[in-house]
Amino acid sequence: LLVGFFAIQHLPIYISASFNQDAFFYGLSLLILAKIINLFDKEEKIDYKDIIQMTIYCSLMTFTKLPSIALIGLMIFIPLDRYKSKKVYYYNFLGILIVLLIALLWLKYYSTMEATDLPKSVDQSEQLKYIFGHPREFMSSLLIGLLSTPLKFKQYFTFGWSYHYSEHAHLLSLPIFGAMLILYPLKLRHKVTNLFKFSLVSVMLAIIVVTNVILYLTFTGVGEATISGVQGRYFYGLLLLLPFLTNITDKIYIGDNFDDIGVLDMEKFQQIILMIAILILTWMSALRIGVYY
């Protein structure tokens, strides 16, 4: 249900119904989240097919959101005892190599294309010279970009890209999103280790940094203090992975099955959560009609 809740949010559905390539990115992000949950929840050991699936998902990420290929690195931080054998575990490195090779081939091909709709102030070679000549100014711009990333998630409450924004929708939806990230019963058969959580934070930071650097080179005027083009929708995959870091239900509930210990009726609880998600989607859709029509 956690995957389903994030799958029917307003902005991802709106963009998925358009021509934008981010629809592909949203689908892959949901598949990766579901796969990681499955790796920690299934009784069977992690096998070759699991590594192949993650390799395919992250390889496809190359063609839509390149920084997100870093998610393949999470596989090597899953505890060794979750794998069928050491040999299976070491195949993760082959998967990482395949993803990197595909990314390099794509970059080589993509570099041959010339954008025709960029501002005249954008020049990658001159921007690189500026970075090496003014490292302090570049690091300042990058730090500002990193610190402002959480604010960019407000974009999930806009009506068509970044043009119209609802403060009321944001404030009313924030507690619901927070409850899903922190309190939704996410009790997996196998514990998410601190090492995996640390690697998750590292991968998230890497994705944010690389995204900002790419847009500084390709979309920001030479020497400008603010990185242009960074949008909250680019970090949808990171939003999905937050429950692994923020969820505290293992400290609240005791036992392996929420129904058995009488804490709550999971079936009814899930129906309520799904209904809330549908109501938010309906409300945002109605607001969109009010804005544009």
Region locations from a protein language model:
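Perimembrane helix-loop-helix junctions
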Residues: 38-45, 70-99
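Membrane-interface alpha helices of multi-pass inner-membrane proteins
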Residues: 50-66, 71-77
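Transmembrane helical bundles and short interhelical boundary loops of multi-pass, membrane-embedded
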Residues: 112, 257-293
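Transmembrane-helix signature of polytopic, membrane-embedded enzymes
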Residues: 1-8
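Juxtamembrane "helix-exit" motif on the non-cytosolic side of transmembrane helices
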Residues: 12, 107-113, 186-189, 212-223, ...
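Membrane-lumen/periplasm interface segments of multi-pass, membrane-embedded glycan/lipid transferases
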Residues: 104-187
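Hydrophobic alpha-helical membrane-interfacial segments at the cytosolic entry of transmembrane helices
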Residues: 52-58, 84-109, 198-206, 272-277
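Short acidic/glycine- and proline-prone juxtamembrane loop motifs at membrane-interface regions
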Residues: 18-25
